[in-house]
Amino acid sequence: MKLHRAYVYDHVRAEGVHVSLTSAEAVDVEGRLYADIGGDRSYLTPVSEGWHETEAAAREEAAVKVAAMAERLTAQAERIRNGGR
């Protein structure tokens, strides 16, 4: 599950879980979501307030990416209509 501004710290690996994730991801280990939200090293569960804030940020980030992609495709279609210019 990818989340905005989430980072899995060494304490996850200390529990015997090998992870290699970017700053845009978190990992669910036995029902617990391990992540860093705003510098707070802890794990979050889907019912915690941090989860909802992070989920909302992830949705917002995805919406921005989709809008940017739509703009690029629209511009590409316009160039094709204009003979590739």
Cite the ranges covered by each PLM segment.
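Short intrinsically disordered terminal tails
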Residues: M1-K2, E78-R85
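A short, exposed loop/beta-hairpin motif centered on an aromatic-Gly-Thr core
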Residues: Y43-A57, E61, K65
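Short C-terminal domain-edge/linker segments immediately following a structured domain
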Residues: I37-D40, K65, R81-G83
